[in-house]
Amino acid sequence: MADLKDERGNPIHLTDAYGNPVQLSDEFGNPMHITGVASSAPQYKDSVTGNIAEYPTEAPPAGVAAGTGAAATTAAGVTTSETTTGQEHHGSLGEHLRRSGSSSSSSSEDDGQGGRRKKSIKDKIKDKLGGGKHKDEQTPTTATTTGPTTTTTTTGAAADQHHEKKGILEKIKEKLPGHHNHHP
């Protein structure tokens, strides 16, 4: 369980909305142990992003512009702050738990203007089904015909078949491994 204490040293018990005790766990269900002091008093700390001191939003010291930065203390003693660039910085516990910048399926793509934009679910599916290539990396294909063309008409069983338009589900099934084309 978490060994959290308030300013006076009294233990803080973590409970849910109904008053039941809560066991902290990570995203994999493993139990977590947190210790610290929960305080509502403003805490001043040095910025790790530069030479900017970060202050709580209530009262910045005299001579410091109000837009310099803001800090808020959570119950676990973990301080989160937001600098004027709009980037959020997580202190203490957040500094130890880093998140990888790489991902197997990207949720954003280049917007063509030097920035990033969030991909739609349709774009994500296209990326997955398109062999993993981005639309920038796909090689363009061109078809050219030279010489005279002839038209032939066929009669019999081949002419009686007509292609039905494939639905999205059929297209996805074709891309799955182990799928064999069983059309009559």
UniProtKB/Swiss-Prot annotation:
Which Gene Ontology terms cover its molecular function?
Answer: metal ion binding
For this UniProt record, the keywords arranged alphabetically read as follows: Repeat
Q: Which GO terms describe its biological process?
A: cold acclimation; response to abscisic acid; response to water deprivation
Q: Where is this region: Disordered?
A: 49-184
UniProt keyword Repeat, yes or no = yes
The answer to whether the entry has keyword Repeat is yes
Q: Which Pfam families match?
A: Dehydrin
Where is the sequence biased in composition, kind Low complexity?
60-86, 139-159
* Domain of life (superkingdom): Eukaryota
GO CC, any one term:
cytosol
Biased-composition ranges, Basic and acidic residues, are 87-98, 122-138, 160-177
Q: To which protein family does this belong?
A: Belongs to the plant dehydrin family.
Q: What does this protein do?
A: LEA protein are late embryogenesis abundant in higher plant seed embryos. There are two subsets of LEA proteins (5a, and 5b), the first ones are expressed when the cotyledon weight reach 80 mg and the second set are expressed above 100 mg. The function of those proteins is not known.
- Sorted alphabetically, which PANTHER family does this protein's record hold? DEHYDRIN LEA-RELATED (PTHR33346:SF5), DEHYDRIN XERO 2-RELATED (PTHR33346)
Q: What is this protein called?
A: Late embryogenesis abundant protein
Q: Which organism is it from?
A: Raphanus sativus (Radish)
